[in-house]
């Protein structure tokens, strides 16, 4: 029997664009908006209005400078040969300064370009966080997205800033490159006695898997009750209807209890935030507090002690 599953199908309503809040605000800085059916396959069919402001403009400018700096270095490594540039693009790498430079400013070809690119990236990321915070504040929203983003910034800053400072050298920071970044990650684990024995790494992976599981469960649940209006979650939160009642009953039948239409989002944000929060702690402790996680695990009784 044919059934509306809603895995790939979507309903698009094309009307006048929603321009957002207009009361007591200047809208001259907002771009126009329009409807695009192809965009509607993934989300809302409307694109715009877009507001960058000072923080957004600074973020995009310095983000572009970071990207351009790395690209110029790759172009230099390719000998200014477009064929070699395209062929070896994934193999090129912008490396941090060698250990002998410590935390000092290095010559351009000895890691100075990496330091410049990292400065551009830091300004871009911080400015974007400011933009996320101020946009939420201007809309009268909670700052949940800014604080969640800050957790990701924590892991990023530990890798490229806090841990190198504690270790006394920029050389321990990751490079900018596709395969070189993967090699750095593998070598990091080898240098510190197998990262799998780092309990904070384990917590991070558990939260990562948990985030994927929660996302799949929540997405499947809402799609399963869209025929009853379940996608209108705000309405279901304040006035529980048959959609949320059926979804809740399904999970009580399945595993004995259920989240609420509001609570599942609290589960999701904390599970996602814990991925980068605990991951950053685990990275920060590696080499600064614990040199070898396998030996640490042996001492604490959960890794085998080989004779």
Swiss-Prot record:
The molecular function terms of the Gene Ontology recorded here are: bacteriochlorophyll binding; electron transporter, transferring electrons within the cyclic electron transport pathway of photosynthesis activity; metal ion binding
**What are the recorded Gene Ontology BP terms?**
photosynthetic electron transport in photosystem II
Instruction: Supply the PROSITE patterns for this chain.
Output: REACTION_CENTER (PS00244)
- Tell me the residue numbers annotated for binding a ubiquinone: 251
Q: Where are the transmembrane segments?
A: 52-78, 110-139, 142-167, 197-225, 259-285
* Family of the protein in this entry: Belongs to the reaction center PufL/M/PsbA/D family.
Q: Mind listing the UniProt keywords for this protein, alphabetically?
A: Bacteriochlorophyll, Chlorophyll, Chromophore, Electron transport, Iron, Magnesium, Membrane, Metal-binding, Photosynthesis, Reaction center, Transmembrane, Transmembrane helix, Transport
* Role played: The reaction center is a membrane-bound complex that mediates the initial photochemical event in the electron transfer process of photosynthesis.
**Quick one: which residues bind Fe cation?**
218, 233, 265
Name of one Pfam family that matches = Photo_RC
Assembly, per entry = Reaction center is composed of four bacteriochlorophylls, two bacteriopheophytins, two ubiquinones, one iron, and three highly hydrophobic polypeptide chains (designated L, M, and H).
Q: Which domain of life is it from?
A: Bacteria
InterPro entries in the record: Photo_II_D1/D2_sf, Photo_RC_L/M, Photo_RC_L/M_CS, Photo_RC_M
Listed under GO cellular component are: plasma membrane light-harvesting complex; plasma membrane-derived chromatophore membrane
UniProt keyword Metal-binding, yes or no:
yes
Localized where? Cellular chromatophore membrane
- Source organism (scientific name): Rhodobacter capsulatus
> Which residues are noted in the entry as (7R,8Z)-bacteriochlorophyll b-binding?
181, 201
What main location does UniProt list? Answer: membrane
What is this entry's stated membrane topology? Multi-pass membrane protein
Q: What is this protein called?
A: Reaction center protein M chain
Source lineage: Bacteria, Pseudomonadati, Pseudomonadota, Alphaproteobacteria, Rhodobacterales
